[in-house]
Amino acid sequence: MPGRAASPAMSENEFDITNALFQNDSDSDNEAPAKQAKRQPKAAAPQQLDFLNGGGDDDDEDDEAFIAETQASANRKASNLKGRTVKKGGGFQAMGLNANLLKAITRKGFSVPTPIQRKTIPVIMEDQDVVGMARTGSGKTAAFVIPMIQKLKSHSTQVGARGLILSPSRELALQTLKVVKELGKGTDLKAVLLVGGDSLEEQFSMMAGNPDIVIATPGRFLHLKVEMNLDLSSIRYVVFDEADRLFEMGFAAQLTEILHGLPSTRQTLLFSATLPKSLVEFARAGLQEPTLVRLDTESKISPDLQNAFFSVKSGDKEGALMYILHNVIKMPTGPTEAAQRMKEENASGKSSKFSKKRKRSDDKAINFKESPTKHSTIIFAATKHHVDYLYSLLNEAGFATSYAYGSLDQTARKIQVHNFRTGISNILVVTDVAARGIDIPILANVINYDFPSQAKIFVHRVGRTARAGRTGWSYSLVRDSDAPYLLDLQLFLGRRLVLGREHGDQVNFAEDVVVGGFPRDGLSQSCEWVNKVLDDTVDIAAQRSVASKGEKLYLRTRNAASLESAKRSKEVVSSDNWTALHPLFNDETSQLEAEREKMLARIGGYRPNETIFEVNNRRSGKPENEEALTTIKRVRTTLDSKKKRAQEAKSEFVDDDVPTKSGDADADDAEDGAFSDEDEAGEGAADNMSLASESDLEVTFSSYNQPSNKKAKKEASATSFQNPEYFMSYTPNNTNMAEDRAYGVHSGTNANFAQASRDAAMDLLGDEGSRGFGEPRTMMRWDKRHKKYVSRQNDEDGSKGTRLVRGESGAKIAASFRSGRFDAWKKGKRLTRLPRVGEAETPGLGADLNHYRGGRRFKHNKEQAPKRADPLRGDYDKMKKKNEAAKERQLGKFGGAAAGGKSELKGTDDIRLARNLKQKRREKNARPSRKK
């Protein structure tokens, strides 16, 4: 009987059951009979199919059940198959990494790549330049370390570093070095750390030892590059970690100088939490056709996010914040459950006895994929002074609070963020600069205490909540001066603007921009509590004063809103619905509150028909000055008629002269003070443009350009040289400032870096001064001692009082970088030259020079002569004893033999002693001298 043909390969949606059907067939070409004999006893009884005696519907049902069971077993997860190692799809195994690196990744504890790792590692493996936007805690360090180790593989015997990682701070560089060592355990790659504060001589020895990977801060690496005249032509892999902080800390000149010395064939990676304009320009100049990698969750607002905007006065912001925390979020006061649990463990004595073991177990038990607490809230403030003030105020209210801002110490910031992520605190008060690098996977609420000046910043703030299919809330406090920015945001999001209860209960917080006020009673109680705290606590009152001064600088430097939104905001703020009760407070008591608010609004808006002079004269019953009363009535009548004519002219201008985009319905909405949805306006504009004729356009634009007064006619005649038929403006006619400042959320691809970077670019204002993010400080300052202006660059790079020299790129660098210490080090080590890039390395050169073996540094026992004793100093006796002790040890500096040496010259005493010893030896031996 001929052998049965092998079954075809399974398709994507099907599976093969022929092995179960023909498991007793020994003529199969795929398996040997011996193997089948071994597998035959393992066959399950239900898989025995009887085709002779069967039939009917029961067999069909059995077949369907069998196929379903087989399919379920094929789709079973690999974790359920005990005793088998199944390769998981979509993990690190599918990225083509070597076995040693996969073992190191598993040992590190990584099982599934994070979103930023899943997007960047395949692109980096294809040798493309990458600009990745990722926050701290999202796994970006492993995202560039894993491809680097995969590319470098092992230590190279040729001289020259091949990988360079630049970090903004010493702490981040140490953290990166730790990750490199852990992931590179299966290789012999050498990694060195070059940061400020360490000995230059030791770093000379490290660089002489031919490292493969250099992890450094820009200032110290540039110092070594200039001092040692390093050749960077061998570097293949360059990483700028947290590039926005690199530029913020003033390393732009150092980065430009370092970038100039790198080869053009390098692969450059740039990771940043945000993209300032200066960083985009740097990426365009230093990277070759880069790919922008950006997570969707960081560029779009989640559809599950619900937004609420509250109109408040400047003096009621603190009370409004307290009302939101107490009554809307219902934030609990006192220590959290995590803080109480930690306190109990510390009290029980476990922490003192098993401190290290407990710390490891707690870190493993914490699941950062889950929400720290169900009330976890981030509050965004404008400056660091606001952060300090709100932190003190919230602590006084009894909330568990953490804080962070840009100039906060790195260790303190890490502790504060760790407390928030682990649930020890419920509230985190931050600035935009400090929060751009903090990654909180799941967040419940976001509060904008100070409304952002750009729509991008709003998206960046609220993008931290409503992730992974969960719902989230954002609450924003909007003052009257913030209304233009709110309208810019409404245009940018393309959502309907709802003021108060003008649409009744038909509002959607996830799709509308809903604005309203707080209940008056609840807000007044919160404001009274805040005022009482300010009166009782002097420190908090002083912090509020400092915060108000910082707010003036912040308002002076924030971006201006669009002109159209500024005009619209006047009408919106003046409407009664601006301060109406917010639809979020929709219950029986809120209905009574709404009626009460209307009554108070009518009372507050009452304007009598008579002036105070007329009322007084009418009450007295003696019109003493009839002439004055007549004059007042005549003036009032004239003013009323002027107001009436102005309103009629305005209504005619809106109805006839101004061309609308979305037809008569939108024009009516504009008269009523409501603003239509941007999508509807876009559809109406498209319909109008498709039906409009040349004559209609000519009439429309000519009526729009007609001057309305003599001044306008004069200006029009001055610019009459512009022929509207041929004139081309340098700006498009449909320019929207809100969209130009922001980016399109629902459009755009990352294929073009110029377009993608323009969409993602965002500048943040500084949180402690008037200087904006990425803006250079004043280049000169007044030197009181020398009575002249000097460069501030000397203060920033540590070379104050010294001159500057030009580097290879033409940029000015500190002259102290060329101090000659490397030449003195080589002379002390008796080295004429070090191996150049491309030559074979000298075995053990770096280890012999600095006793650096196996990553351990051995302490030397060098002795030096003390300073000579000065009789005029107070420590003369002490130094004299030190000199006498040094002379006794016979150091060569004071004459005589060195310690442990032997003098070649013999004196009379030495000769006499030698003769006596020789005579004693003769007597001891008692042997006569030999005579020949």
From Swiss-Prot:
<dbReference type="GO" id="GO:0003723">
    <property type="term" value="F:RNA binding"/>
</dbReference>
<keyword id="KW-0690">Ribosome biogenesis</keyword>
<comment type="similarity">
    <text>Belongs to the DEAD box helicase family. DDX54/DBP10 subfamily.</text>
</comment>
<dbReference type="GO" id="GO:0005730">
    <property type="term" value="C:nucleolus"/>
</dbReference>
<dbReference type="GO" id="GO:0006364">
    <property type="term" value="P:rRNA processing"/>
</dbReference>
<protein>
    <recommendedName>
        <fullName>ATP-dependent RNA helicase dbp10</fullName>
        <ecNumber>3.6.4.13</ecNumber>
    </recommendedName>
</protein>
<feature type="region of interest" description="Disordered">
    <location>
        <begin position="1"/>
        <end position="62"/>
    </location>
</feature>
<feature type="domain" description="Helicase C-terminal">
    <location>
        <begin position="360"/>
        <end position="515"/>
    </location>
</feature>
<keyword id="KW-0067">ATP-binding</keyword>
<feature type="short sequence motif" description="Q motif">
    <location>
        <begin position="90"/>
        <end position="118"/>
    </location>
</feature>
<feature type="compositionally biased region" description="Basic and acidic residues">
    <location>
        <begin position="861"/>
        <end position="891"/>
    </location>
</feature>
<keyword id="KW-0694">RNA-binding</keyword>
<dbReference type="InterPro" id="IPR014001">
    <property type="entry name" value="Helicase_ATP-bd"/>
</dbReference>
<dbReference type="GO" id="GO:0003724">
    <property type="term" value="F:RNA helicase activity"/>
</dbReference>
<feature type="domain" description="Helicase ATP-binding">
    <location>
        <begin position="121"/>
        <end position="293"/>
    </location>
</feature>
<dbReference type="Pfam" id="PF08147">
    <property type="entry name" value="DBP10CT"/>
</dbReference>
<dbReference type="Pfam" id="PF00270">
    <property type="entry name" value="DEAD"/>
</dbReference>
<dbReference type="InterPro" id="IPR050079">
    <property type="entry name" value="DEAD_box_RNA_helicase"/>
</dbReference>
<feature type="binding site">
    <location>
        <begin position="134"/>
        <end position="141"/>
    </location>
    <ligand>
        <name>ATP</name>
    </ligand>
</feature>
<dbReference type="InterPro" id="IPR027417">
    <property type="entry name" value="P-loop_NTPase"/>
</dbReference>
<feature type="region of interest" description="Disordered">
    <location>
        <begin position="639"/>
        <end position="719"/>
    </location>
</feature>
<feature type="compositionally biased region" description="Basic and acidic residues">
    <location>
        <begin position="639"/>
        <end position="653"/>
    </location>
</feature>
<dbReference type="InterPro" id="IPR014014">
    <property type="entry name" value="RNA_helicase_DEAD_Q_motif"/>
</dbReference>
<feature type="compositionally biased region" description="Basic and acidic residues">
    <location>
        <begin position="903"/>
        <end position="913"/>
    </location>
</feature>
<keyword id="KW-0378">Hydrolase</keyword>
<dbReference type="GO" id="GO:0016887">
    <property type="term" value="F:ATP hydrolysis activity"/>
</dbReference>
<feature type="region of interest" description="Disordered">
    <location>
        <begin position="784"/>
        <end position="807"/>
    </location>
</feature>
<feature type="compositionally biased region" description="Acidic residues">
    <location>
        <begin position="665"/>
        <end position="682"/>
    </location>
</feature>
<feature type="region of interest" description="Disordered">
    <location>
        <begin position="835"/>
        <end position="932"/>
    </location>
</feature>
<dbReference type="InterPro" id="IPR011545">
    <property type="entry name" value="DEAD/DEAH_box_helicase_dom"/>
</dbReference>
<dbReference type="InterPro" id="IPR012541">
    <property type="entry name" value="DBP10_C"/>
</dbReference>
<dbReference type="GO" id="GO:0005829">
    <property type="term" value="C:cytosol"/>
</dbReference>
<keyword id="KW-0347">Helicase</keyword>
<dbReference type="InterPro" id="IPR000629">
    <property type="entry name" value="RNA-helicase_DEAD-box_CS"/>
</dbReference>
<dbReference type="Pfam" id="PF00271">
    <property type="entry name" value="Helicase_C"/>
</dbReference>
<keyword id="KW-0698">rRNA processing</keyword>
<dbReference type="GO" id="GO:0005524">
    <property type="term" value="F:ATP binding"/>
</dbReference>
<keyword id="KW-0547">Nucleotide-binding</keyword>
<comment type="function">
    <text>ATP-binding RNA helicase involved in the biogenesis of 60S ribosomal subunits and is required for the normal formation of 25S and 5.8S rRNAs.</text>
</comment>
<keyword id="KW-0539">Nucleus</keyword>
<feature type="compositionally biased region" description="Polar residues">
    <location>
        <begin position="700"/>
        <end position="709"/>
    </location>
</feature>
<feature type="short sequence motif" description="DEAD box">
    <location>
        <begin position="241"/>
        <end position="244"/>
    </location>
</feature>
